[in-house]
Amino acid sequence: MSQANAATKAYSDVFFNASLEDIDPEIFGAIRNELGRQRHEIELIASENIVSRAVLEAQGSILTNKYAEGYPGKRYYGGCQYVDVVEELAIERAKKLFGAEFANVQPNSGSQMNQAVFLALLQPGDTFMGLDLNSGGHLTHGSPVNMSGKWFNVVSYGVRKDDHLLDMDEVARLARENKPKLILAGGTAYSRIWDWKRFREIADEVGAYLMVDMAHIAGLVAGGQHPSPVPHAHVCTTTTHKSLRGPRGGMILTNDADIAKKINSAVFPGLQGGPLMHVIAGKAVAFAEALKPEFKLYAKNVVDNARALAEELKSHGLDIVSGGTDNHLMLVDLRPKNATGKRAEAALGRANITCNKNGIPFDPEKPFVTSGVRLGTPAGTTRGFGVAEFKEIGSLIAEVLDGLKVANSDEGNAAVEQAVKEKVIALTGRFPMYGYQG
């Protein structure tokens, strides 16, 4: 063997067999540290969850090597016979899980799935309605800083000031006045049940499409804990992570064949090129997991745990927006503790409790300060926390916030936060992740 060939073989051996730790210790170290953070912290960010080892294996598979522009059976590249199997499984499982006639599993994210629907059903300058960001909507539902707010004429609806519930009379009035081409229902920080039937009635009255973004509650819909929008909406979108507990990505569902054709063309070639086949494999695995009876129990536990956490926080003098929760999340009004969301997020983070600052309806604070935090139970429930643990977590949160109130500074109360941190580490140690103890 020549010296050049020997060098090539040696390089190939390293390339195909060396570990991440050997090749890139900096990235390996960052991943190791993140794993440690996840193991030892309580994750209460409502949009986050923990995937199974099976999903991790699928997403980290050699499918990442394959280009597959197009759809199963109609690809622009050869060698797609096996990734076709993967995508077809993902599609069929998604349809079965949500009772839909058509599914597109290629969107790379929640933003891209919503963009694809807009591309399929709207023209620039068209009017659509969406939930105001300050009432619990999403950036892609018409925020002025987002493409959805720049390309279209957006009419936002909101919640009532007295009870923070959706004002369906306002939705109907705005629809009649503005004649939108599309009405978008769904949000990221609304803790009550959505009345899909009423939304469809309003949409039909004004001749609009009804689009539902169920990204946050898809797992609860699949698990029978929230009414499904699929029988009512012209088109539904959802991320595949959050309460659905899959890899990060998006999906679009419809029962209308004509809309399905438009959606497929909008996703590819309209918006994306080659799909991420390793992620689609992870989606397929997550859908299979969600079709099992155990997932229904998981979804029930998510809601039970959220209600327990909300009630515990209320018992410590905190206000919950709308008075409680019917799903996986809640908005906590921090004003009774004289705290802002920014301060509370930082203080809880120092105590190993992860959440995000969040505006509350009619919030007087700036968006990067806020009067509230958003809390969710999907990740903790996946880990095995039950009602007892979430009551304990509620007490720990109150302990940190009370300490913050006494300190009345950005630095917080170091003694209280350290004491809570030790309790959090003890709690998380009883619920190991990925076979890891301690």
From Swiss-Prot:
Identify the residue position(s) of the site Plays an important role in substrate specificity.
241
Instruction: Print the keywords alphabetically.
Output: Amino-acid biosynthesis, Cytoplasm, One-carbon metabolism, Pyridoxal phosphate, Transferase
Q: Which GO BP terms, alphabetically?
A: glycine biosynthetic process from serine; tetrahydrofolate interconversion
Question: Its Gene Ontology molecular function terms?
Answer: glycine hydroxymethyltransferase activity; pyridoxal phosphate binding
- Tell me which EC number(s) this protein carries: 2.1.2.1
PROSITE patterns from the UniProt entry: SHMT
Q: Where does (6S)-5,6,7,8-tetrahydrofolate bind?
A: 133, 137-139
* Catalysis: reaction(s): (6R)-5,10-methylene-5,6,7,8-tetrahydrofolate + glycine + H2O = (6S)-5,6,7,8-tetrahydrofolate + L-serine
Location in or out of the cell: Cytoplasm
Class of the enzyme per the UniProt entry, highest EC level: transferase
Names of required cofactors:
pyridoxal 5'-phosphate
Main location group: cytoplasm
Q: Which Gene3D superfamilies match?
A: Aspartate Aminotransferase, domain 1, Type I PLP-dependent aspartate aminotransferase-like (Major domain)
Q: Name one Pfam family in it.
A: SHMT
Write out the GO cellular component annotations.
cytosol
Pathway involvement? One-carbon metabolism; tetrahydrofolate interconversion; Amino-acid biosynthesis; glycine biosynthesis; glycine from L-serine: step 1/1
Q: Which family would the database say this protein is a member of?
A: Belongs to the SHMT family.
HAMAP family, per database record: SHMT
Q: Which PANTHER family match?
A: SERINE HYDROXYMETHYLTRANSFERASE, SERINE HYDROXYMETHYLTRANSFERASE 1
Q: Which NCBIfam families match?
A: PRK00011.1
The record's note on quaternary structure and interaction partners says: Homodimer.
What this chain does, per the record?
Answer: Catalyzes the reversible interconversion of serine and glycine with tetrahydrofolate (THF) serving as the one-carbon carrier. This reaction serves as the major source of one-carbon groups required for the biosynthesis of purines, thymidylate, methionine, and other important biomolecules. Also exhibits THF-independent aldolase activity toward beta-hydroxyamino acids, producing glycine and aldehydes, via a retro-aldol mechanism.
Any idea what this protein is called? Serine hydroxymethyltransferase
- What is the protein's species of origin? Brucella abortus (strain 2308)
Lineage per the UniProt record: Bacteria, Pseudomonadati, Pseudomonadota, Alphaproteobacteria, Hyphomicrobiales
